[in-house]
Amino acid sequence: DLVMLPCYHWTRCLLVPKGHPLEALERVDIEDLARFPLVTYTFGFTGRSELDSAFSRAGLEPHIVFTAIDADVIKTYVRMGLGVGVIASMAIDEKEDTDLVKLDARHLFQSSTTKICFRRGIFLRAYMYDFMSLFAPHLTRDMVDKALTMKTQYDVDMLFSDVELPVR
């Protein structure tokens, strides 16, 4: 039984080499994206299920040619011309990735939420509380302790429903 505490939301972007046909579009839609091979995260890791859901909602099937658990591997595949990358927007390094073009995909895919999880009933040491509050400032010791008193994950989610999480 896990307690899952929300930390921040994150969004996806598309990554293409300079000169790619998608770069010329003012706004990429899901039908445009479906015309190209995709390189993205492994299913069940880092929000891949949201990509599949977005295509499913449009009645389309994504053409995924490679998957990886690491954004840098995906960037390498994009650089090799193997497909359009679909990665977390925060994985782009403005200094290192100057050969690639980042295209907004917030309108295509719902954001995901990064959470800190731990087993219910675990003894949380002071350094664990410290880490949580450093990683996500709204996860104060009081809030974490309140979450621990909740009986269900739904109750935990409701506890944090008024907290405005940052977007990264």
For the regions a protein language model found, what residue spans apply to each?
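Residues that form or flank phosphate/diphosphate-binding pockets in enzymes
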Residues: A24-L25, T42, S49-E50, A126
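Beta-alpha-beta core module
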Residues: D1-T11, L25-E26, D72-G121
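Hydrophobic hinge/microswitch elements
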Residues: G44-V101, K151-R168
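Flexible hinge/capping segments at coil-to-helix
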Residues: L2-L38
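C-terminal effector-binding regulatory domain of bacterial HTH transcription factors
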Residues: S89-D97, H107-R168
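Active-site-adjacent beta-strand anchor residues
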Residues: L15, T40-Y41, T67, G85, ...
